[in-house]
Amino acid sequence: LKTVKNKVKSRVETELAATGGLLRLAPAWVPRSFLQPGLRIKLHPDDTYAYGLNRGGIDERWFASTTVTANEGRADDEGLSYCVVGKERFTLHQAVAECGSTLVGRSIWRKYGKWPVYSKFFDNMGPIPHHMHQSAKQAKLVGQEGKPESYYFPPQHNNVGNNFPYTFMGLEPGTTKAQVRQ
């Protein structure tokens, strides 16, 4: 596919008219160097380490994403969803930037000026490190945005549980109850 870098608005409008309002998105595969893939996200096993062993195995499939990953050594477009039109592709980020409220609706466009969410299939063999996703209010306190993602674990893709369905949380010695609440 030829990658189009700019001026995608007319392509988007033509595709929306031709498909009754749909844009086809290619899968956005995301590797994680610190987790073991569960191999249930409809990626051929030979492609699990397509980015190289140093990058880790692909264990996430992002949907409708205009967000790049925060992975070390990532490709510039890692995490971005691509719209596929004929033999061309362009990022959903580009499409939203050029088409605005046509794609995301007036209220979302007015409030955020972008598409602020994405979803993912998330598939690991073992437990993930305990972590939290801050709300917009919490994240603003440290100069960040809230984490705009959701998880879905479809039962038809999870007929076998992972090999250790637990997670652990530890606190720095001296951490107070008030600090945890904060």
Could you say what each language-model-derived stretch is?
Residues 2-178:
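Transition-metal
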Residues 180-182:
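Catalytic-pocket segment enriched in acidic/His residues
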